[in-house]
Amino acid sequence: MKDTISLESFLAASDFEAHDARLIAALARAGSGVARALSGANVASTSYDYDFLGCAGSRPRNVHGELVHELDAFANDLFVAELAKESCCGGVLSEELREALDFRSHSPERFVFFDPLDGTANLEAHGLTGSIFGIAPWAGSTRASSLQPGAELVAAGYLLYSSSTLLVLANRERVDSFVWRPELDCFVASEQVLACPPSGTIYSLNEGRVFDWPEPAQIWLAGLKSGLFGRAYSQRYAGAFVADAHRALVQGGVFAYPADARAAKGKLRLQYEVNPMAFVFRAAGGAATTGSGDPLEVAPESGHERCPLVIGSRLEVESFETALAADTTRRSA
């Protein structure tokens, strides 16, 4: 049997800089803690006694106006606590923080973006959830660091909480995966580097929003369904961005949440959802687009800015861009 390689051993032998390795280890510790909490949580509970932003005993709303589940708050605090232990981390921005948090480190090297618990709406149905993270250079201040474009990221990844807990980790050149082994109390490397297939047969999207899509996007989707690329596509939709994106990464295909009539800037958040995932897909040979360009090149105006996203295999993503570009050309003719 092949010797197991722990995440710690992998990082020690990798090209990651020492401070990045420490932050990745901290993120992994937080992720394993979230996984343990999820496995033992009474997710159908209607009691919200967790004291989040001074709102003990009630369900507060985050900066997006969304109800905060007690596990959202728990996961957020766990990631913050683990990252705050590392002096190289100058600050963080997450979905559950109204503003970027400054750790007031004396020697900051990095800034971390994260979504502590993606797919919270799935909890009561015991569905799939995840966490997303991106590591960027420290840019001199918390505000400047939190408004860096995704192209500045040096590492990114996500955790998928499923039948097992999976950690996917990318630098600019490769993507590796690790499985949580409770009996060893560590993440263990899988045997292969992840690569996104050039095309697939699965699309993941919210069909209930399609009628709000712009016409060229609707035509593109109809083409997938009708055999545009010489094969039939099937829909798979978990309702958790991490889960749907991971399927596209390993099996090929596409995840789409483009701009529509109800959400001109899409639904997903640029800094801690879109950019880290786009970074992973680029490193794995996949692609991502806002519909008009690379999300990693978008200059954010706000830490909580939203962004349209189509992500997955190159064939499907590029065909979406082509469809929208052709419509723009036709309208301007």
Which ranges hold each PLM region?
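Short beta-strand-loop/turn "lid" adjacent to the catalytic site in phosphate-handling enzymes
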Residues: 51-70, 104
